[in-house]
């Protein structure tokens, strides 16, 4: 039997399997990273929606805004998001700066923020 008729040796098979397994591990890492990224994007999306909602509410409210901080909880995406609205006077006393920060459930880190200005009434 000649060398070309014998087929693959055990060593060649082990090397081929090792190369294939490295490729499989790389694909699994990529899938895991995609899942983590999707979860982070979901958090930022809902936090941004809550921040925008509260900021627009502050701009469009008919009554005057109290200077200082207020906080509350808003439901979005089936979860309760904590928001804090800080109202401060701007450089011009007729302008108010409204900063809304939003934290995801079970954490204290800020995931979304909106800053708007409105006329003090």
Where are these regions (language model features)?
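Flexible, low-complexity segments enriched in proline/glycine/serine and punctuated by aromatic residues
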Residues: 8, 14-18, 32-121
């Amino acid at each position: 039997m000649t060398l070309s008729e014998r087929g693959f040796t055990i060593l060649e098979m082990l090397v081929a399997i090792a190369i294939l397994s490295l490729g499989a591990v790389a694909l699994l890492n990529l899938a895991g990273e995609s899942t983590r990224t999707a979860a982070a994007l979901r958090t930022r999306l809902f936090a941004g929606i809550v921040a925008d909602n509260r900021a627009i509410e502050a701009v469009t409210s008919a009554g005057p805004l109290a200077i200082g901080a207020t906080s509350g909880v808003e439901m979005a995406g089936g979860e309760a998001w904590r928001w804090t609205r800080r109202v401060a006077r701007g450089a011009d006393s007729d302008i108010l700066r409204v900063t809304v920060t939003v934290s995801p459930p079970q954490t204290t880190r800020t995931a979304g923020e909106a800053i708007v200005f409105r006329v003090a009434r």
